[in-house]
From Swiss-Prot:
Binding site for ATP: G41, P42, S43, G44, S45, G46, K47, S48
Enzyme class: translocase
Gene3D superfamilies associated with the record: P-loop containing nucleotide triphosphate hydrolases
EC number(s) from the headed UniProt entry: 7.3.2.3
UniProt xrefs under PANTHER family: SPERMIDINE/PUTRESCINE IMPORT ATP-BINDING PROTEIN POTA (PTHR42781), SPERMIDINE_PUTRESCINE IMPORT ATP-BINDING PROTEIN POTA (PTHR42781:SF4)
Reactions catalysed according to its record: sulfate(out) + ATP + H2O = sulfate(in) + ADP + phosphate + H(+); thiosulfate(out) + ATP + H2O = thiosulfate(in) + ADP + phosphate + H(+)
SUPFAM superfamilies registered for this protein in UniProt: MOP-like (SSF50331), P-loop containing nucleoside triphosphate hydrolases (SSF52540)
Alphabetized GO MF terms: ABC-type sulfate transporter activity; ABC-type thiosulfate transporter activity; ATP binding; ATP hydrolysis activity
Protein name: Sulfate/thiosulfate import ATP-binding protein CysA
Chain's gene name: cysA
Length: 344
């Protein structure tokens, strides 16, 4: 049993199988008290199952789960003292915002004065002051999700679990709520785990990211660690855009990079484009230019037929004045290679 009081959640060798499908396999995870951790992975990676195991909504086939130092493996959902927010709000449609937030407090028989004070505090915290008498149907999707978060926080849970909380919202609202959630967490400091398949969301919000694939943890680290030092080919290819090339590609023939394994991963922003030949470049031709707003994407074709995607800042693109069919010279600034079939 963990003794460290700074540990909010400890998952030890947890596995879960549904029929013949191994949803979670031998997962170990430590979440520090007060931190915000993202479970990130594609569909079927096991991230939502792991969250439900922590919540007590599923029971592990093997392994132990500790919450704030105590063994909670066999505890009921109620006894775990968690707040849970689903993707689809799950608000009571017939209750006002204020009554939705108060629901858990009233179940616990708090006094009317205490309930009223806590609800008003939370309305201010989630920036919904003045909307307490509205019904969920009178709110936007983003506002409804804030109500769901306020309701989860009302009972002062030791752990807050969020299952793709912004997945049902449009892109602009999602981005606004990501920033808001980070600020909210910095105010309340509740140990929080949230599930997402959105790499940008995880990078922007989380203190630590747990990258999952096929029920296993591929890597745990800060957003910078995950991006700059991916532990496996899956992490490299899942976190951000990447070109995957054979190490025999012409772009590596000019030297300068160590690519000992057959497969090489090259980020689009790590490709340098020049108009004139410079050391360690190889000739290429522009296939296509795509304007992404904040940057420009250039698709370049090497002499061996390999097509690379490169990203350039807008000012660099303007300096180069790139056009389709133009001959250019390219070189990789850095790249990563892994042994074939490499995994942790």
């Amino acid at each position: 049993m963990p003794k460290d009081k700074a540990v909010g959640i400890q998952v030890s060798q947890v596995s879960k199988q549904f029929g013949s499908f191994q949803a979670v396999k031998d997962v170990d995870l430590t979440v520090e008290t007060g931190s915000l951790v993202a479970l990130l992975g594609p569909s079927g990676s096991g991230k939502s199952t792991l969250l439900r195991l922590i919540a007590g909504l599923e029971q592990p086939d093997s392994g132990r789960i500790f919450l704030t130092g105590r063994d909670a493996t066999n505890e009921s959902v109620r006894d775990r003292q968690i707040g849970f927010v689903f993707q689809h709000y799950a608000l009571f449609k017939h209750l006002t915002v204020r009554k939705n937030i108060a629901f858990g407090l009233e179940l616990r028989k708090h006094t009317k004065e205490k309930v009223r004070a806590r609800v008003e505090e939370l309305l201010e915290l989630v920036q919904l002051t003045g909307l307490g008498d509205r019904y969920p149907s009178q709110l936007s999707g983003g506002q409804r999700q804030r109500v769901a978060l306020a309701r989860a926080l009302a009972v002062q849970p030791q752990v807050l679990l969020l299952d793709e909380p912004f997945g049902a919202l449009d892109a602009k609202v999602r981005k606004d709520l990501r920033s808001w959630l980070r600020k909210l967490h910095d105010e309340v400091h509740v140990t929080t785990v949230f599930v997402t398949h959105d790499q940008e969301e995880a990078m922007e919000v989380a203190d630590q990211i747990v990258v999952m694939n096929h029920g296993k943890v591929e890597q745990i680290g800060s957003p910078a660690e995950i991006y700059d030092n991916p532990a496996t080919p899956f992490v490299m290819s899942f976190i951000g855009p990447v070109n995957v090339l054979p190490n025999s590609s012409h772009i590596f023939q000019a030297g300068g990079l160590d690519t000992p394994h057959p497969e090489v991963f090259l980020r689009p922003h790590d490709i340098e484009i020049a108009i004139d030949p410079i050391p360690e470049t190889v000739p290429a031709r522009i296939d296509r230019i795509v304007h992404l707003g904040w940057e420009v994407q250039a698709e370049v074709r090497l002499e061996d037929g390999q097509v690379l995607v490169a990203h350039l800042p807008r000012d660099r693109y303007r300096d180069l004045q790139l056009e389709p069919e133009q001959q250019v010279f390219v070189r990789p600034k850095q790249a990563r290679s892994f042994p074939l079939n490499y995994s942790i």
